[in-house]
């Protein structure tokens, strides 16, 4: 805010100095009120789906995808469009029947009135019961499957009989019932939820069931003595319900990937030692305390079902109850079976139902209990066995456990983490529990302690820098208030409904920015105090006398005066820093990706609110500190104060040596630094723009955790197993081409809300019934088949190009001699193409309906989409035009149909891929050809557009384009700020060159670290500009404001004053980012790495490259300096600059606080630069015109209340001034 250098702001300085409590309380009340309103009126952010918002909106492809989504939503059974006209007619008939029933309630005969009423009542009760127990029915089906038995017992079976291998015994002696009586408990319609019965039962029926269960259990225990020898005995007893509860592994169950470790890590898992180690490992998995609460139990006991694993299948094959009993012969037996049956599995002659449905073309031993299929498909990697090779090598094996994937497994996952699933030979390297989003949501909150730790470190740095715990506390509160205010403006004022988790990354950034502003303000405050004491001295270090009162001073040194000077410099300096950073964030709003757009707005708003608090809350807090801690100074300092002073002296000496070393290296070796950093910048540019380049992501899966996390390892290994390959291998999935007419490619939804897709907009010019349109559609379908991207598809594809099917439909005879009814089909018969519009509109719905009635027809998305039009009378039908048609009539009126949209679909010969270049070539070739075709289309069909499976490609294309746009906008904003505040074209060019090379080096380092241009990386690149430009901005401005216009002297002047604060800012922000690298989630780690890299690179380039450039070719004596009339006028008003002078100190109690007293003691020590802007002086002395102006409205009795005499002996510290 440049207005702080204006005389009109004196009232504000007066308020800060005289009424700081009022300012602090007012701001606190306002901030707390805003935060409460935001939390009460707005829902708390939901991070259950971290990838929500990672989509493109507003682009050409994005609008088409949104319109396509809205079209699909509108064509479902609840929308206004229908692919099958019969569905629309059926709904119309139902609605009319409902109306007629209400208009004529007594049309039925009275004799059936009570009968129908009772029947309707029973039907209603049955429907209600069916609805209530729909979920239970699914469980009962599985339950009955496990308890299945033959429909009637064999006559030669005894009373106690084991039927089948399902584990169900029937006790005819006790129950004395039919074969189905023993299954009576399974027919209950109880409401069962995870083993809890929530309904009431009849007492007698309950007692009977209990007796039945007891008798059944008695027989189960007796059955333990039944013979179990022989593989051919299919009726042998298995534990309760079979070895695996009569079920097979499925993807919906939790599963673990096992790998061999140890000295024999390269050996195959498929040997006796490997299987025994896996057996032990699965026991570790199932023995955690909470496992029994989540596992799928056997239906008749509380025992958990066995895990589906390779050792368990080997034990079942060997007819052993435990996998610990396996021998080498058992492993060999399984090996022989798998080798002999592999060819049938590889040739797709087996599936998961071979033991139930006799359709598998494989030998019986290969189908028995699905051992072969389950082992090869689920439990071993796809390279385990190779065709025509008797050698097997198993690198990865899978263990499935009977625990369904759910977000409720988080406690169980933590127990597995504590157990460490590993033994001497094998370990679990990956797992899939369906917990990715839930765990990420938890870690997003639990890792906040890292943010707090980083904030604590920054606040500790502020404490050491300021020496005031009060200022440190108020600075921390200011940062918290800035976040709360930003959320208020984001959610309430700007009405953003979506809050992505990436917005939380702004917390890390604002901690560093807020601390930098505190450093800046306190630095200027210290320098102002130092300059005042050095100019108003009556005591030397060799003599000591009483300090004079304020009445005896020639110039009254008021708190208001000090505040005015500090604010005039600090407010403008903080404004420049905040402007560049907020501008870089707001530039991200130009992105078409929802999450990036929201992050840019929130992060930019946080920076703005932080700036507002730093020019209101922080000055008032400093004013309170000067009042609150003003005490009488004593010459007898306690030991703690002496230690602090000694520590400060050591730090001061180190800083002095550090600054002198850097200054001498730049002044003496400027050409060497230019050569080194210039070469690094050129090399970085090659890395960024040529090789390897900033690669686009090639995985649609967005990584949430570190690469070594079990969930992320599973994402990289899952394609090693056959059951995952159909979902991940796209070699058989070809890109579909959807050509759409009748719908505008418009997205009128909220681009900042991923749940808002707007409405479907129709093309009013669309009309497919005209003769030119019919001819063009037919020619278009024929032209598509001649293109190189078209794939010839076998089978019936009737709806893909509906016009061809309609032509065949219209060729039929009007009266078929083979039809006994001899129904006249006019006008939909014996017609010549192209058809008359009214005939086309009338017959098209019939043609489509007949096609849907075909048994071999499989409905898709292609074809015309019908909507209901206003009902017309019979005599109005001949006057209908456009896309209207009619099919049936009731009460003498027609129900016309409108062809509101048209979709023509073909399959291309391009396989789906996540590689950007491949899909880009496909999209551009099809799009270019289609646009050329539309130029020859009649006007009513020129509004068509093409779309396909382009969602991920759209994100890739947007990232590559929008990131470049955001960089250009941020760089342009930075250049504008530099021109405005340096007022020198050459300095601005040098600074922009430095920032550009800093960005190149930052991005190059990130590329070498393996980063790809994904969502977070795009944000990081644009944010780096705002963070990197600050250091260059400070160096450039102070070079321009140097009191000496000669190049070498100006360079040395800047280095002696800027190095310290920039090092402090870079260190605090970089270390705060370094702390975030200890997080468990990837976004926190990446933002930490980014902050560390950008701080190091930008500081080194600003200090060594820019200052070396200014040392060698910097402007001097006003060369290429812009002349602004207003600034020239201000510059002529003052020409005094801050100079160090020997310390002769005079002070009043108002200024002798922990802050000011430290300044007194360090008056002769090294004083860094002032972050001043737009002024010809770094610190103006309060004398003459400025002093009189600042005190014009201040009553002199204001100072009298703070007057106290002090006597102290000060020690002179060595100065670092040259």
Swiss-Prot record:
Keywords assigned: Developmental protein, Glycoprotein, Membrane, Transmembrane, Transmembrane helix
PROSITE patterns noted in UniProt: SSD
Gene3D superfamilies (alphabetical): Multidrug efflux transporter AcrB transmembrane domain
Subcellular location: Membrane
Stored SUPFAM superfamilies: Multidrug efflux transporter AcrB transmembrane domain
Keyword Metal-binding set for record: no
Record region (Disordered): 99-135
Effect of residue 1030 to N: Loss of function
Compositional bias segments (type: Basic residues): 104-124
Keyword Cell inner membrane: no
Effect of gene knockout: Death during embryogenesis with a strong segment-polarity phenotype.
Superkingdom field: Eukaryota
Membrane topology reported for the UniProt record: Multi-pass membrane protein
Swiss-Prot/TrEMBL GO biological process terms: germ cell migration; patched ligand maturation; segment polarity determination; smoothened signaling pathway; wing disc pattern formation
Signal sequence range: none
Classification via InterPro entries: Dispatched_Hh_regulator, HMGCR/SNAP/NPC1-like_SSD, SSD
Cellular component, GO annotation: cytoneme; membrane; plasma membrane
Transmembrane segments: 21-41, 443-463, 473-493, 504-524, 570-590, 598-618, 670-690, 975-995, 996-1016, 1019-1039, 1058-1078, 1087-1107
Function (record text): Segment polarity protein which functions in hedgehog (Hh) signaling. Regulates the trafficking and the release of cholesterol-modified hedgehog protein from cells of the posterior compartment (P cells) and is hence required for the effective production of the Hh signal.
This protein's name: Protein dispatched
Organism name: Drosophila melanogaster
Classification of source organism: Eukaryota, Metazoa, Ecdysozoa, Arthropoda, Hexapoda
